[in-house]
C-alpha cells in the first residue's frame, strides 16, 4: 500500500510539472504586439534593435567584427552563441529557432517587443481586458496581474543580459557564451542603463491611459511620461 501511494504521488508530481511546462508563457512575435501598439512598432522598426539580426550576416559590421577578432566574411546567423542576443526568445517556448525566417510574420529574428517585455502569450489578452474595463467603469487593473503572467518590468536586467554579458562584467549574472564586444574592444560598448535608454530609446513613448495601476513600476517610467506624446485619435 505504501509503495502504491508513493507511486501515486510521483505520478501526481509529474502531472503538475507537465502542466506547469505547458502553461509556460510563449513568444508571440512583433506582429501580434503591433496589432494594438502600432505606433510603438513603427518607431521601433527604425532602431538598431529591429535590425540586430542583420549584423550577424557576412560582410556586415566589418570593422566592428575585426576589432572583436571575429571573421567579417563569416555568416554568424546560425551560430547559437551569437543568435541569442540578436533575436527574441531564442531557446525558449515560441522563441526564435536556428534556420527560422528572421523576417517572418513574428519577426523573432530581431530584438523585438518581448525581448524587453517578456513572452506575451499569457498577458497580452489582459491588456485588452484592462482597457475595456477602464472605458466601461473608469477602473484600473492591478499591474501585478500582468506581471504574474510573464510581463517583465525589470528592463535593466533585460538589457544587461546582453549588453553586459562579458567576462569581467559588473553584471553578476553574466555567463557564457560571452559577447566579444566589450568596452576594452571599443568604448562605445560601455553600457550604462539610465544613459542608454534616455538617449537611444527603443521606441517612441506615448501617454499611458491608466489601464493598470500599482507595482511593479519601472523607475524610468515617470521620466518618459513627462515628455510622452499624446496618442492620435
Where are these regions (language model features)?
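Repeat-solenoid scaffold signature
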Residues: 139-171
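Sequence context of c-type cytochrome heme-c attachment sites
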Residues: 22-109, 120-152, 182-233
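Short cysteine-rich clusters marking metal-coordination/redox-active sites
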Residues: 33, 82, 113, 159-162
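Compact mixed alphabeta submodule
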Residues: 157, 172-183, 192-194
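Substrate-binding/catalytic groove segments of enzymes
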Residues: 122-124, 167-177
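Bacterial N-terminal signal peptides that target proteins for export
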Residues: 1-12
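N-terminal signal peptide c-region/cleavage motif recognized by signal peptidases
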Residues: 17-18
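Helix-to-catalytic-loop junction in kinase catalytic cores
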Residues: 86, 117, 163
Amino acid at each position: 500500500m505504501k509503495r502504491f501511494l508513493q507511486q501515486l504521488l510521483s505520478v501526481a508530481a509529474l502531472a503538475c510539472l507537465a502542466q506547469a511546462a505547458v502553461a509556460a508563457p510563449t513568444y508571440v512575435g512583433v506582429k501580434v504586439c503591433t496589432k494594438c501598439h502600432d505606433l510603438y512598432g513603427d518607431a521601433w522598426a527604425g532602431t538598431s534593435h529591429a535590425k540586430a539580426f542583420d549584423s550577424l550576416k557576412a560582410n556586415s559590421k566589418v570593422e566592428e567584427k575585426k576589432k572583436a577578432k571575429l571573421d567579417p566574411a563569416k555568416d554568424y546567423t546560425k551560430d547559437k552563441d551569437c543568435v541569442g542576443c540578436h533575436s527574441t526568445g531564442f531557446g525558449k517556448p515560441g522563441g526564435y529557432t536556428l534556420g527560422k525566417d528572421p523576417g517572418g510574420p513574428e519577426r523573432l529574428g530581431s530584438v523585438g517587443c518581448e525581448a524587453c517585455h517578456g513572452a506575451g502569450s499569457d498577458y497580452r489578452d489582459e491588456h485588452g481586458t484592462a482597457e475595456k474595463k477602464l472605458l466601461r467603469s473608469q477602473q484600473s487593473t492591478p499591474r501585478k496581474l500582468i506581471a504574474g503572467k510573464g510581463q517583465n518590468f525589470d528592463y535593466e536586467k533585460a538589457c544587461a543580459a546582453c549588453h553586459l554579458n562579458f567576462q569581467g562584467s559588473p553584471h553578476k549574472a553574466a555567463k557564457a557564451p560571452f559577447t566579444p564586444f566589450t568596452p576594452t574592444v571599443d568604448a562605445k560598448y560601455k553600457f550604462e542603463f539610465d544613459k542608454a535608454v534616455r538617449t537611444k530609446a527603443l521606441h517612441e513613448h506615448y501617454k499611458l491611459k491608466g489601464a493598470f495601476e500599482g507595482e511593479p513600476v519601472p523607475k524610468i517610467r515617470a521620466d518618459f511620461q513627462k515628455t510622452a506624446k499624446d496618442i492620435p485619435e
